[in-house]
Regions:
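Glycine/charge-rich catalytic "coupling/switch" loops of P-loop NTPases
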Residues: 1-24, 28-32, 41, 48-76
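Glycine-centered tight beta-turn/hairpin loop motif at sheet-sheet or coil-to-beta transitions
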Residues: 37-39
């Protein structure tokens, strides 16, 4: 995890979770990306353009970068 933090040192999102992409679903203007980190999953909704630009694919390693002001909590 320390190595991954070094990789993204120049971005403002200090909370970084590195995992494997389990799913990328593009629908219209948005894309859903599911990242597996250990035995947990995190789902992010990003623009379809961003998903295409980053060429996100199932099985790739990716990092979820979170800013404390941009985290949403949902009751489950």
């Amino acid at each position: 995890m320390i190595q991954s933090r070094e990789r993204f040192r120049n971005v403002s999102g200090r909370n970084q979770l590195v995992g494997k992409i389990e799913e990328v679903t593009i629908s219209g203007l948005l894309a859903k990306v599911v990242l597996v980190i250990g035995d947990q999953k995190i789902t992010s909704i990003i623009t379809a353009d961003a998903a295409r630009e980053m060429q996100l694919r199932k099985g790739q390693t990716a990092a979820a970068l979170m800013k404390s002001t941009e985290v949403m909590i949902v009751r489950v």
